[in-house]
């Protein structure tokens, strides 16, 4: 009797195949761990792919020093639970220069603390493949990127120089210094992610659940006051509102949404009714025209 895989089981099988393919083909892979819901699913799939052994590669977190405190606490917990080595890299040059989202703007801050920080870490550890949790439904530049995304020796992505991926066959050939970014969740949607988290009971950062939190309305977004580095502008005031986050990044650049959804079924129901993108609250996606594609061409995730 033939067993028909469900939609989520098909996605799971494809992702596990991709993860195992990378381990078989590359010498020194790493998993980029941004601590968000997509990273949580990707880590869960990696652990499934090699169970009962831990995944044979480390986790890498590029720490901008501006992540939510709850994210950092969760990062340590999951690294310990998975039994994987956690590498944390900070662009110390950017820290010395005092680069922050407030003083330098989101575009320069992202380039220095995220993109340059990532390239520094990949060069330092000589990783030849890096897993990322990006999905094609998130944003238009990600929609046209391959699952195995070739990067030059300078970590640059050329959207006009991508390799065909027919019949789940992937071209992994690279020259010294070149690398591949691999996206096992490419064909998943936001709904798939939430349903899989619910089905598999995957731990996620509590910020995804609605709770009363201190926020400031700024530029049409609700910014959570996560520490005393957030300076109020004239006329701004801190309010207590029931909010949650659909996407997580650096707290000064990530907008919350007003919500009462504090369980996974409620989050899924809310997501089904919304008419805005999950990345609507990510300021870095809108700081210049074609913003995400330009960042990716410069070496961003």
Curated annotation (Swiss-Prot):
User: What pathway is this protein said to act in by its record?
Assistant: Sulfur metabolism; hydrogen sulfide biosynthesis; sulfite from sulfate: step 1/3
Its Gene Ontology molecular function terms? ATP binding; sulfate adenylyltransferase (ATP) activity
Which GO terms fall under biological process for this protein?
hydrogen sulfide biosynthetic process; sulfate assimilation
The cross-references to Gene3D superfamilies, in alphabetical order and at most eight, read: HUPs
UniProt keyword Nucleotide-binding present: yes
EC class of the enzyme, as a word: transferase
Q: Which InterPro entries does this chain map to?
A: PAPS_reduct_dom (IPR002500), Rossmann-like_a/b/a_fold (IPR014729), SO4_adenylTrfase_ssu (IPR011784), Sulfate_adenylyltrnsfr_sub2 (IPR050128)
Q: What's its EC?
A: 2.7.7.4
List keywords of the entry alphabetically.
Answer: ATP-binding, Nucleotide-binding, Nucleotidyltransferase, Transferase
Q: Which SUPFAM superfamilies match?
A: Adenine nucleotide alpha hydrolases-like
The protein's annotated catalytic reaction(s) are: sulfate + ATP + H(+) = adenosine 5'-phosphosulfate + diphosphate
HAMAP family, per the entry: Sulf_adenylyltr_sub2
Give the UniProt family note. Answer: Belongs to the PAPS reductase family. CysD subfamily.
Q: What does this protein do?
A: With CysN forms the ATP sulfurylase (ATPS) that catalyzes the adenylation of sulfate producing adenosine 5'-phosphosulfate (APS) and diphosphate, the first enzymatic step in sulfur assimilation pathway. APS synthesis involves the formation of a high-energy phosphoric-sulfuric acid anhydride bond driven by GTP hydrolysis by CysN coupled to ATP hydrolysis by CysD.
Kindly state the subunit structure of this protein.
Answer: Heterodimer composed of CysD, the smaller subunit, and CysN.
The entry's protein name is Sulfate adenylyltransferase subunit 2
- Record the organism: Citrifermentans bemidjiense (strain ATCC BAA-1014 / DSM 16622 / JCM 12645 / Bem)
